[in-house]
């Protein structure tokens, strides 16, 4: 990861490279920029807000894990708090392509898992595909969300997705990233399972009711959470395992560092993530133990 950052720094404008390097090369950099950090970079570089976000995209793309396509995409979202969150596309050898995570989904779930309750804008290397436009239409801030592309005027999501189909068409009022706590608890004393329940309580699954969460523990002892992000169009839904894997990659860890995993889901759900979670983890490392609980 450090070498990717160094390559991006070498290609960036000197004013940005000089002031960004101490931030992005720090051991505790977590693929996000605070409002204060971003505002300082604006002053130091003399760039406009849009120009700076576009200039930061190569640093987001540095997190890309694309062994199949070798097509590296970065995305940056700004939460309602003003903080910026990086994201990048993620692919998996040995499993079907439906497990792929797009850069927009990565950045959005990154902000979500760090507590944001909505987004004001998203900046992307390339025009968002239909899959991602639909995924973004599930957000609490979809109507106001702005999209910035390199060398293009900023537009609203619904300029890219006119006459959209969304939650309201299915009679659903809840939205992805809205503040929620589903109230699940377990008497299981396993610490990793407890964290998976924590993720489950933040999940969004109004269509199948399969509220679910995943917790991954790595050799470092750190734990990464993933909550299920369901979508009105079904296919763009993002499974809890993928959301957790995104957090792991954006923290600078590697899949081979995963030591154990836990999945918890509602017994009232019309679907289950168990088989896909097991098969994807097995493709990464067949020795990863997976604990499972249905509540």
Swiss-Prot record:
Binds 1 zinc ion. GO terms for molecular function: cytidine deaminase activity; identical protein binding; zinc ion binding. GO terms for biological process: cytidine deamination. Keywords: Hydrolase, Metal-binding, Zinc. The keyword rRNA processing does not apply. Gene3D superfamilies: Cytidine Deaminase, domain 2 (3.40.140.10). Zn(2+) binds at residues 102, 129, 132. One of its GO terms (cellular component) is cytosol. It is an enzyme of class 3 (hydrolase). The keyword Coiled coil does not apply. Its cofactor is Zn(2+). It catalyses: cytidine + H2O + H(+) = uridine + NH4(+); 2'-deoxycytidine + H2O + H(+) = 2'-deoxyuridine + NH4(+). Substrate binds at residues 89-91. The active site is at 104 (proton donor). Residues 48-168, 187-295 form the CMP/dCMP-type deaminase domain. Disulfide bonds: none annotated. InterPro entries: APOBEC/CMP_deaminase_Zn-bd, CMP_dCMP_dom, Cyd/dCyd_deaminase_Zn-bd, Cyt/Deoxycyt_deaminase, Cyt_deam_dimer, Cytidine_deaminase-like, Cytidine_deaminase_bacteria. It comes from the Bacteria. HAMAP family: Cyt_deam. This is Cytidine deaminase.
């Amino acid at each position: 990861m450090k070498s990717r950052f160094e390559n991006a720094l070498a290609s960036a404008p000197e004013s940005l490279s000089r002031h960004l390097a101490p931030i992005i090369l720090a051991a505790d950099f977590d693929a996000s920029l605070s409002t204060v950090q971003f505002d300082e970079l604006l002053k130091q570089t003399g760039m406009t807000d849009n120009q700076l976000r576009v200039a930061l995209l190569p640093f987001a793309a540095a997190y890309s894990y694309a062994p199949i396509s070798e097509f590296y995409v970065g995305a940056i979202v700004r939460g309602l708090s003003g903080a910026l969150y990086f994201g990048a596309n993620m692919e998996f050898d040995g499993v079907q392509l439906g497990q792929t995570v797009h850069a927009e989904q990565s950045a959005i779930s990154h902000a979500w898992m760090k507590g944001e309750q909505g987004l004001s804008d998203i900046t992307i290397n390339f025009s968002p595909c239909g899959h991602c436009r639909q995924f973004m239409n599930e957000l609490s801030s979809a109507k106001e969300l702005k999209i910035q592309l390199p060398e293009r005027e900023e537009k609203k999501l619904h300029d890219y997705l006119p006459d959209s189909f969304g939650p309201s068409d299915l009679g659903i009022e809840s939205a992805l990233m809205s503040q929620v706590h589903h109230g699940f608890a377990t008497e299981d004393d396993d610490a990793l399972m407890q964290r998976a329940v924590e993720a489950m309580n933040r999940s969004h699954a109004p269509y199948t009711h399969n509220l679910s969460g995943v917790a991954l523990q790595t050799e470092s002892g750190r734990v990464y959470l993933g909550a299920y992000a369901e979508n009105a169009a079904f296919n763009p839904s993002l499974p809890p395992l993928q959301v957790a894997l995104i957090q792991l990659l954006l923290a600078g860890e590697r899949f081979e560092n995963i030591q154990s995993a836990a999945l918890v889901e509602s017994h009232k759900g019309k679907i289950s993530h168990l088989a896909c979670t097991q098969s994807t983890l097995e493709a990464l490392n067949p020795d990863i133990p997976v604990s499972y609980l249905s509540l």
